[in-house]
């Protein structure tokens, strides 16, 4: 198993399990490849983070204030601004994982966000917790390959 801790990027969207951005610290045997938050040896930079991101876009409508999302697709969250309120919200991005993934998460925020997420991807099960907003945040993840 690998443990990862990340700061930066879209950490605030912790509702999207297993996705982090920034610096990551891994504690694992040197030969083991990555989970959802880092790409092994001792320290790695992320988005090596998304070897198989644990989550997806929400089939439900995206709200600018809060949302509950559940997905089974291969997408990782990205951020976009909603013109009406200029608030970042999570949207589906191009696929970056070859493995099927499933995720369950809740996020809330207007200009910033906080959330909690649980994700599973065939190649890398992961747990993710995040706080923060667009351009900054803190995320904690665990996964194994």
Swiss-Prot record:
Sequence repeats lie at residues 27-30, 33-37, 39-42, 86-89, 92-95, 98-101, 123-126. Keywords: Cuticle, Repeat. It comes from the Eukaryota. Component of the cuticle of migratory locust which contains more than 100 different structural proteins. The tetrapeptide (A-A-P-[AV]) repeats found throughout the protein are also present in many proteins constituting the protective envelope of other species. This is Cuticle protein 65. GO terms for molecular function: structural constituent of cuticle.
